[in-house]
Amino acid sequence: MRAITTHTGSWDVDPFCPCARNRKERYQMNSCLDAFSTTFDAFTPMLNFHEQQDAQTEWRSCRVNSQTVAPLDASSPLSYSSFAGKCSQEAVDDTKTGLGLAMGLYDGYYLIRDTAYKSLLDRAKISGSALPKLSRTVLAAVLNECLHLHSAEALLLLREGKISAVHSGDAVDYSVLPISELLGTLKTKLDARFPGNIFLAGYTDHAITSASWQLPAQREDLLGTYAKLLAANGKATMAGRLTPGVRFITSDTGVASAKVSALLTGDQHPIHIGSCVAVDHRHQSKIADFESAMDQLFAQFGDAVSKLQALMEVHLDYPVNAMTRVCKKLSMPKKAADEAIAMFEMAYGDNPATAHDVFMAMQEIPYILKTEHTPESKLLIVEENMARAMSLRWSEYDRARAVS
């Protein structure tokens, strides 16, 4: 897949025209491509981007058995003319070298984005690791045989000339929560409850959107007790540089709920310490539900810090073994985890440590991945998984026996 250049400023052309290009400097917006991603260094451009994207997004209802999947590869009879007016030649070529599938609807064929693959299988009610190994012709035939068995409603997300998701059409199973409205609601709530908040960074690709803020004015309220404990345990330098923050994540392709998590910023990489607010895209959820949930952010942030603080009381006799087992339990990327474990072992040797020491040492993992240019979406998943370490029963991992 081609590398996609990202954008961090304002747009000088419509970024939502098929594969539109920003002609300023070196930036190139190939927003129709599956591998597209972009970053933002200010909130307003990010909000503007999603407002325009939401305005040009189509949500279309149809019956599952009315969908027909077609192969799109070198041997496919479909060509650019089959998608006339819906996408660019570049988007067609991108799909041919990627997922290699298209869908026929009442008004013609649409490309299927890779983000739609899982939800398409869900509508067909099939799964299996062998499916991606099939030729596109065989895979399309299998999908059609299964799709045509089901008369339930589906809700298609059409964006940038491709089908980006094939959700259930039942409002109990999937509720649309426009990203621009979530962002606007979040900013209003942050300004009201956390005045002085500072936007740090934003990220968007076709699967996930995230944004993070720092909350410097609430440092004493949120981290005061924790910072004092750090200082009392010889970690005054760490205590002095940490500042509370929050990260927002959402997805309209089925990857994530609309959630806000607690962060500690100021270190080499933000430390994710747990989810505070989460509203699923289910059960007829509305933006108002997210707005109401945000009222609990301050209290939930305090609970997350208390959990982190409690790790300082969990003493480990075999911290290197414990770290190794916890990383395995949480499915941390092995190469980065091994490197972080080796660094921790060099620092602590055979000496005892606390679960807090190990948790902080694990923060090297996302930093290592970041330096290796790991995609942002994968980093977010790693950080969320790592935060689960705060709720583990550490005694189960603190064993003398070497890890196999």
Regions found by a protein language model. Give the residues of each.
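Extreme N-terminal basic, low-complexity initiation segments
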Residues: I4-T5
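Short, Lys/Arg-enriched N-terminal segments with co-localized hydrophobic residues
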Residues: G9-Q28
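Feature for intrinsically disordered/low-complexity regulatory segments and propeptides
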Residues: N22, R26-T185, F194
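Intrinsic disorder/low-complexity polar-acidic segments
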Residues: H167, Y174-S404
